[in-house]
Amino acid sequence: MKKSNENDILETTLSIAEKGYPEAYQFLLNAYKESPSSFGPQTFYFLACLADGPGAALAWLRKAIQENNWWYRPEVLEDDDFAALKNDAAFLSLKAISDDRYAAAVSKSTAIFSWKKKRADNLFLAIHGNTQNGDVARADWEPIVGTSGLWQLETVQSAEPDGYGTYRWSYDSTSYLPVAASIESIQNEGYHKIACGGFSAGCDMLLRAVTFSPARCDLLILQSPWIPILWDHAEDVVRVISQKNMELRFFCGAEDEDCLPMAKQLYAVTKQAGCNVTLLWN
């Protein structure tokens, strides 16, 4: 199973969980049983959160941390779903192991820009969302960018670990800097067109990059945009998109109650400012 398929299953699980944990747990458990080796740390975390009772939750965490040597960001193991385990000695031991592994990962983690040299006329830079990585971004965007050779697909991976094998972005004044630096570094490499695509938190990093640095691209594609930059810098974002003459495209699920309002907000103000902007949802 491809990682993107696991992500799709987890998204479906979240939707089912809104109606009830037992149904969501059974759905995910059935999917896992079909191909156990195809699922990673995030699936085990979901199963632990959705499990019926602390014993079952602990079993999934033990399998993830003790048997598979995975780890999680400390905050996620402090979730309310694990309240019944907060004083459990076995749980605290597993959490301590996970926390130590997380600290070790943070100490040596650096941002990764996949670009090595110009290999096509056009460049597409993909920015992953939280609990993802550069490989996931490449797999998600490759079907859209295509493999005809017209576009060179590259990625930027955050320096901030989220969990075992995954990374995250922070909505602050520094997390976006690798994205900005990556865009700036290829602006004068002779590409005919440079496009950037982000998913969820990756969209916010792209907007921060073009707003707070000289970074520029011809096209910004924002998929399911979670963009808290709008809370304090909406006017700056609109001004920069207009001044730098960048085309803006939004894609979002019609039932996405978190991201669609943000997409509509930025679409409205950029459209009013005369920017080349498109919003599609389904």
Model-derived features with residue positions:
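Active-site signature of alpha/beta-hydrolase-fold catalytic machinery across serine-
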Residues: R208-F212
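Short beta-strand immediately N-terminal to the catalytic nucleophile in serine-hydrolase-like folds
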Residues: C196-G198, Q223
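Short beta-strand-to-loop junctions in surface cap/lid or active-site-entrance loops
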Residues: S107-D121
